[in-house]
Regions:
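Helix-loop-helix
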Residues: 22, 128-129, 140-162, 226-228, ...
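Soluble non-transmembrane domains of integral membrane proteins
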Residues: 5-271
């Protein structure tokens, strides 16, 4: 039946996670709102990923092209599907919702385009059931495409000038993760045969993807349609003999970048959660953070618990460093005396200082060690906060309503600066005046630097500083008491 009423052009589908619009012309996914994600913090409007408006175009197309395919423009205008209803809603008791669109070709081939939605799932099954009631063999190629304008990323939360990747990722068994931005697609269009691969369009926190059937060979292609980027795949021809029925299709994913979900959709799709070059630290950090969140239910408290855990892992290293610094502080008068005696003879001064350090078991670089060791953890946690959609709009307490962006009132960075100043008082004053000046400026420089960091990261540093100050204060008092005993 090709006389579907064009005034009811759209089929509306609502599940627990989606509010989706399907265009009955060709049966494309032209709009999708993600009901569990707000567009803005404290907003009541869901985040829209797919969209087809005058200002914005980002859709998932699928069709049957080739010799007899109804979506082949040579075979006439695009098919207009009919549906039993114009709106479908997943009932509370349902775990699956199937939406069937029907079309019959002039030659008598019945085509059902079936969309399958599952509860709490962002994967959508797109399948064609082709029943050839004609007298001749029928042949067409299944295709799936991501079609998008080149507008920026509306979901991006810019952090310290770093922007999330916006563009296409293609996965093949030979090259499991290859990125292409719009410039790459323009200069080097893709055209390769792939089996067991996928293609996805990434933005900050969210993605859309097409995943062909396992072991199904497909031609991955990128082209341009005016100002639009077209990224998709085409299967080899599907042949349906007269009187036979054949099924063909693929999976689409329209949703958040969540590792657990993506792992179940396709191999390597979880790599779209890009934790940077320190992923081997970032991933375990995220797993632990997520585990804490499962217990306490607050991402801010989870970050505090993670900080305590990391501090515990580096406890002995920090203790060794703080002992060295406490001894350095205790011998400060001796260093000052040396400066008076050998100030003009730098060589002698250096020799005497090293001898003193050796005698008192002081490592002059000991103070840098805890910070140096923690830097990879700090950088990794930055990527965890930047990339994890779970932390988008995640509140902590009081004025912190979103841990993934900067503190709106700069209170945490100021607390962090104050804690650094307090820590500096516990450290020995460097013998070199220039070095001493630099050390005094450090808390100010760090505070300015941290003003625009995600609040979750500043929270980590504040808690880490408080724990460090407690440990350092205890060790310094202990060493000073021991050295005072030695004198007596």
């Amino acid at each position: 039946n090709n006389t579907a009423n064009i005034s009811d052009q759209y089929v509306h589908v609502i599940t627990d996670v989606f509010d989706i619009t399907i265009d009955r012309v060709s049966g494309n996914l032209v709009s999708s709102s993600l009901l569990q994600y707000d567009r803005e913090l404290n907003g009541n409007e869901p985040l829209k990923l797919l969209s087809s408006t005058q200002n914005r175009l980002y859709v998932l197309e699928s069709g049957l092209i080739g010799r007899d395919g109804p979506d082949n423009s040579r075979n006439g205008s695009a098919p207009v599907y009919s549906s039993a209803q114009t709106s479908y809603q997943m009932a509370e008791s349902e775990n699956q919702l199937e939406v069937d669109l029907s079309y019959t070709t002039d030659s008598g081939v019945n085509i059902v385009k079936r969309f399958t939605f599952n509860r709490d799932d962002y994967e959508i099954g797109v399948r064609y059931l082709i029943d050839n009631q004609s007298e001749n063999e029928w042949q067409a190629n299944f295709t799936g495409k991501i079609v998008r304008d080149q507008a920026g990323d509306q979901t991006s939360q810019n952090s310290m000038g770093i922007k999330a990747f916006l563009g296409l990722v293609v996965s093949t068994p030979e090259d499991p993760y290859e990125k292409y931005d719009f410039d790459d697609l323009r200069e080097n269009p893709l055209n390769q045969s792939v089996t067991n691969g996928w293609l996805a369009f990434l933005q900050h926190y969210f993605l859309t993807a097409w995943v062909p059937e396992p072991d199904q060979q497909a031609q991955f292609q990128t082209t341009r349609r005016g100002p639009l980027a077209v990224m998709g795949f085409v299967y080899p021809a599907t042949t349906v003999p007269a009187g036979n029925t054949v099924e063909v299709g693929a999976s689409a994913y329209v949703g958040p970048k969540i590792i657990d979900r993506l792992e179940t959709v396709a191999p390597n799709l979880d790599r779209t959660v890009d934790f940077g070059w320190l992923f081997f630290i970032s991933l375990p950090l995220f797993i632990v953070l997520d585990w804490f969140h499962g217990i306490v239910g607050n991402w801010g408290v989870s970050i505090i618990l993670l900080t305590v855990l990391v501090k515990g892992l580096f406890f002995h290293l920090s203790a060794t460093s703080y002992r060295s610094m406490a001894r350095m502080r205790a011998v400060a008068p001796k260093l000052a005396r040396m400066k008076e005696l050998y100030g003009d003879d730098r060589q002698r001064m250096s020799t005497e200082m090293m001898a003193l350090y050796k005698r008192e078991k002081i490592n002059p670089l000991g103070g840098c060690l805890p910070i140096l060791v923690q830097m990879p953890v700090f950088i990794s946690l930055y990527w965890v906060l930047f990339e994890s959609v779970q932390l988008r709009h995640a509140p902590f307490a009081l004025w912190i309503h979103d841990l993934s962006v900067m503190d709106p009132y700069f209170i945490l960075p100021i607390i962090m600066g104050a804690s650094m100043m307090l820590q500096m008082h516990l450290n020995p004053t460097p013998p070199d005046p220039m070095q001493a000046k630099i050390m005094k400026l450090m808390p100010i420089v760090f505070t300015i630097f941290f003003l625009w960091f995600p609040a979750g990261l500043v929270l980590y540093w504040v808690v880490n500083n408080i724990l460090s100050i407690s440990q350092q204060w205890y060790i310094t008092r202990k060493i000073e008491a021991q050295m005072a005993e030695k004198k007596h």
